[in-house]
Structures are given as C-alpha cells and as structure tokens.
Amino acid sequence: MSWETLAYTDAGIELLMDAVSGKQLTITQAVGGSGLANAAVLHAQTDVTGERHALELLGIKSVEENGSAARRVKIRITGAEDTYTLHQIALFGRQTGAAEDTLLLLVQDDRGVEIPAASTDQEFEFVFTVVIVISRDAEIVINLSAGCRFFSGY
C-alpha cells in the first residue's frame, strides 16, 4: 500500500482558496472507490471511480506538515456489505449555503486494500489520514460521522 497519488480537484482548489479568504468550508463526507483513474486526470474528477462506499469521518486537527500549516483529517474504513478492493479515498465538502457537495481531493493506490464483508469480519478496521496543506487562517470544519466520539488531542 503506497497511497502516494494525491490530487486536489480543480473545484476543490477553488473551495480551499475561498476558505483561506474567509469562507467556511465544511468537509461533509469521505467516500471510497473501487476503481482506478489515470493519475493525470484525477484533478478533473467529480466523484470516485467504480463502486462508491461511504467511509467515516473521525476528526480534523490543525498540524504542521514539513514546515507548512495543514489540517489532518482522520477517516475510518470498516467492513462493507460485500468484499471489495478499495483503490480511492475521497473527501467532499461544501461552503455555507452551497446546494451540493464538491469533490475536494482524491488519494489513489494502484494495489488497493481488500475490504472484507462485515458479515465475515466484524473486527476489520482501517484508519487513514489525509493531510491538506493550507493556511492556518482557513476556516475548515468537519461533519463527524454518526456514532463517532470526539477526543481532545486527536
């Protein structure tokens, strides 16, 4: 597992730039995809490729990454209805007043991770962290997934 291919989408870059300018950006959902896209066109994607799977948003934290201000978003993947190979992890968001979610970024791994059916492995859990490099001034919040508890110091 390398998960080295990360692309901010064209629409996602606009939302992040607006967040730096003072408009609040809410990260609304994390989604997994079973398909692969050419890395050269990931920036133009509007959704994940292949089957779509809802993932859990666990939290967001301001951090410093290689000397730059950033936000660390924590995502949890658990067993699905049916076994599948997870190749893409995406974050969606929207600005206050926007009608629809926008794909902010995609992380892709060519090999992927096999996600088992929950009926065969109820204990399976894969926690993934996405780092968004952005100014400390950006106003970014997150919608925690139902059933998640907030822990201070994440």
Where are the regions that the model predicts?
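Fibrous stalk/shaft segments of extracellular and virion attachment machinery
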Residues: 150-154
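N-terminal assembly/attachment segments of tailed bacteriophage virion structural proteins
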Residues: 1-146
